[in-house]
Each structure stands twice: as structure tokens, then as C-alpha cells.
Amino acid sequence: MVLAQSAAATTVQELQLGWAVANYELDGDNQAARFEALIIEAEAAVEANPKDPELLIWQGILKSTYAGKASGLSALSLVKGARSSFEKALSIDDMAMQGSAYTSLGALYYQVPGWPIAFGSDKKARQMLEKAVQLNPAGIDSNYFHGDFLLQQKEYGAAKVAFEKALAAPDRLGRTLADSGRRGEIRSRLANIES
């Protein structure tokens, strides 16, 4: 059991680093190819460890991030797959990765179109993101996505507070590139609010 958990943890770390490189250092065809390869790796890891909520969360994160860069029906298929991964992770352990499935599912709900095209819902987004911040009040991602949602809702004061919390979040072990990239996104959002 310990060996299986260790192997899964290594896989999660590899997926995290791969995501950060693909998201913040690559673009164009190189980025697309890397995301596609990471999704295949995540699917294999989940197939080998179907009850691992962290692998499910990362499978969903990879699909949802790539969907944001894709278009048309392929993007819709990716976001539906991501939602399924997050929902499975929540059903296994909603506290995994400090409630990251709530953060990621909430982000999907406000970023995808609503019915009849997809499943987007500002109401569900707010519920999920508020739960995420409740579970991880000092987290960079929980506060960033909550702030981004509030910004889209034109709740500028609350968005600024959330972004400032995200900016002040402690660095995560082994996530230097991801944290640096996210802080850049936060500063950009804050500049938009303040201009």
C-alpha cells in the first residue's frame, strides 16, 4: 500500500510539473502536444489507480486547462471529462489536496457556457469556490479562482481582496514554476481592477 501511494505521489508530482511547464513555458503546437501527452499519462495513472482522488483531480486539471486553449467540440469533450474527474474525486475524498476539486470544478462552472451548449452555472461556481476557500483559506489557487469569478461578476472589491490573499499565499513545495506563473496572472487581474 505504501509503495502504491508513493508511486501515485510521484505521478502526481510529475503531472503537476508537466502542467506548469506546458501552461507557463510552452505555446502553440508544442503546448498542445505536451498537454495531449500529459492527458494520456494522467488517464493511464487513473486507470491504474482509479480510487486516487489526487490523480483524478490532476486528470481534470489537465483536461480543463487544455480545453481553455482548444476550440469547438474538442474543448467541450475535454471540459465534460474534467467535470467527471472532479466529481469522482469529490465522491472519494472531497478534502484531497485541500479541496482542490472544489476549486477546479468551480472554475469550470463559471468558465464554460451554460445550457444548451454546456453545463456552466454561476450559482454552482459560487458554491464550489466558496467551499474551496473555506477548506483552503490561504491557498493561492482557491483564492485566485474565487477572485477571478468575482471579477467576472463585477464584484470588484471582493475580487481584489481574494486576489490579494492569493498573492500572499505561501509558496508550495515543488511548485515554484506554477506559483510564479499564477502570481503573474494575479498581478495582471489586480492591474485590471485598479485601472
Question: Where are the predicted features?
Answer:
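N-terminal leader/linker segments that initiate helical-solenoid repeat arrays
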Residues: L3-E41
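TPR alpha-solenoid repeat register
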Residues: L55, Q98-A101, S142, T176
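Short coil turns that delineate tetratricopeptide repeat
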Residues: P50, D94-A96, P137
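Terminal, low-structured helical/coil segments at or just beyond the last alpha-helical repeat
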Residues: Q152-Y156, K160-S195
